[in-house]
């Protein structure tokens, strides 16, 4: 149960105990069999479906608070659970259960001239701290992915989704118990006080091995600034879609509409549309017309306004804004070179897409843009661990160390070397 504060212990004591329990659970979990972990995951999926009514009721409490606090529509969308989304959460957990177990996988092996046989083998990271905001589904995704990779996890969701996350967490614990795995392998921070985040960022006395923040720019900035343990950083998704002069117009229209409007509140939603100046007179109006008809606000450069007067003027700030809403900024560029320059200047290095038929243009896009995910002739909304066949993701890392792109079960492991000899000494 979540409480505002514990009157008998201060926050540091509460969190130290959480860390101690996680560390103790990590050891047996690291050697759990694939069968045990999969049994726990499938049992957790069953428990989520069985608790559907309780989860929806908990979510209604969170939604009522969000409405009371005047939260934005995009925030409410991320917070909302319904029958279909609960089904998807359970299906996502089952999909994770079907994935190959990464723990113990031999990544590489070789023999040395002296007869030593060396293997590089995947191992769990240990204890992972996940700090997130309004997405209650992250409770399930993060818990399930960490379990599959043999890691204990400490979950700290935002107070806005506290009731929903707590209801989902109960189902995850039932899964652990069904497989005779330590119940403390998945823990939810039992207090809503923000000081708990600060304690996690300090590492809980060496208990936490890595922090994964999943939320807005201010959350990620705080984590990166204060963390004393490694961080898988997930910055905002300032995602670009570039329509090249070689693009098929019908394809471009379908992709642009989906990339922006399928779900506007996710990090893979396109925030900026770039159109090759060479085809602006034929391609711009149909694409923007589709977006406007779908309820999207268009913010354009002066050139865009001249061709599409219904647009609003874009400011310099628009090019570096993650809207997470039905708003898109639009500019014309001088072909692929102009697109590359614009993207590399304003991108958060999350996801970019190109619609083009010219192979050399696509090759330049792939080679010269430094973002975690690059797509050709596909919507930016495929920037998702589930769509990558990972079952789910704990986030999309935009940094370059250890994990980049969707963080799935493989990215939640480290490795060690096993060296087998027959009496060799260096002498």
UniProtKB/Swiss-Prot annotation:
GO CC aspect terms: cytoplasm
EC nos: 1.2.1.41
Key words, A-Z: Amino-acid biosynthesis, Cytoplasm, NADP, Oxidoreductase, Proline biosynthesis
Top-level enzyme category: oxidoreductase
Subcellular location: Cytoplasm
Main location group: cytoplasm
Cross-referenced SUPFAM superfamilies: ALDH-like
CDD domains, per database record: ALDH_F18-19_ProA-GPR (cd07079)
Database matches in InterPro entries: Ald_DH/histidinol_DH, Ald_DH_C, Ald_DH_N, Aldehyde_DH_dom, G-glutamylP_reductase_CS, Glu-5-SA_DH, GPR_dom
Presence of the UniProt keyword Translocase in the record: no
Domain of life (superkingdom): Bacteria
Pfam families: Aldedh
Catalytic activities: L-glutamate 5-semialdehyde + phosphate + NADP(+) = L-glutamyl 5-phosphate + NADPH + H(+)
GO BP term, example: L-proline biosynthetic process
Function: Catalyzes the NADPH-dependent reduction of L-glutamate 5-phosphate into L-glutamate 5-semialdehyde and phosphate. The product spontaneously undergoes cyclization to form 1-pyrroline-5-carboxylate.
Protein name as catalogued: Gamma-glutamyl phosphate reductase
Organism of this sequence: Brucella melitensis biotype 2 (strain ATCC 23457)
Record lineage: Bacteria, Pseudomonadati, Pseudomonadota, Alphaproteobacteria, Hyphomicrobiales
């Amino acid at each position: 149960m979540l409480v505002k504060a514990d009157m008998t212990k201060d926050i540091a004591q509460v969190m130290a105990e959480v860390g101690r329990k996680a560390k103790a659970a990590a050891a047996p979990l690291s050697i759990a069999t694939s069968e045990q972990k999969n049994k726990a995951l499938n049992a957790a999926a069953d428990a989520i479906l069985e608790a559907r009514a309780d989860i929806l009721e908990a979510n209604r409490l969170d939604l009522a608070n969000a409405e009371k606090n005047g939260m934005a529509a995009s925030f409410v969308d991320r917070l909302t659970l319904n029958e279909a989304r609960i089904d998807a959460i359970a299906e996502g957990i089952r999909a994770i259960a079907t994935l190959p177990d990464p723990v113990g996988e031999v990544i590489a092996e070789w023999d040395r001239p002296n007869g030593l046989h060396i293997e590089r083998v995947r191992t769990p990271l240990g204890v992972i701290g996940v700090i997130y905001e309004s997405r209650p589904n992250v409770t399930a995704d993060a818990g399930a992915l960490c379990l599959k990779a043999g890691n204990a996890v400490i979950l700290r969701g935002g107070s806005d989704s506290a009731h929903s996350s707590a209801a989902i967490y109960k189902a995850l614990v039932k899964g652990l118990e069904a497989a005779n795995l330590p119940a403390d392998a998945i823990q939810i921070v039992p207090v809503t006080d923000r000081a708990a985040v600060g304690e996690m960022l300090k590492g809980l006395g060496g208990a936490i091995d890595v922090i994964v923040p999943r939320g807005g720019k201010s959350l990620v900035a705080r984590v990166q600034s204060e963390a004393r343990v490694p961080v898988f950083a997930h910055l905002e998704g300032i995602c670009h879609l570039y329509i090249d002069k070689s693009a098929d117009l019908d394809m471009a229209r379908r992709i642009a509409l989906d990339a922006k409007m399928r779900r506007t509140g996710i990090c893979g939603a396109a925030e900026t549309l770039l159109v090759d100046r060479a085809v602006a007179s034929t391609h711009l109006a149909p694409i923007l017309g589709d977006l406007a008809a779908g309820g999207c606000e268009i913010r354009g450069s002066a050139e865009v306004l001249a061709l599409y007067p219904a647009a609003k003027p874009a400011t310099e700030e628009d090019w570096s804004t993650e809207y997470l809403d039905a708003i898109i900024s639009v500019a014309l560029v001088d072909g692929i070179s102009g697109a590359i320059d614009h993207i590399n200047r304003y991108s958060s290095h999350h996801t970019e897409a190109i619609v083009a038929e010219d192979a050399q243009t696509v090759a330049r896009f792939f080679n010269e843009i430094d973002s975690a995910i690059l797509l050709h002739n596909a919507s930016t909304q495929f920037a998702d661990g589930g769509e990558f066949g990972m079952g789910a993701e704990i986030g999309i890392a935009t940094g370059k160390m250890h994990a980049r792109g969707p963080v799935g079960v493989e990215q939640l492991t480290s490795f060690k070397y096993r060296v087998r000899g027959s009496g060799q000494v260096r002498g």
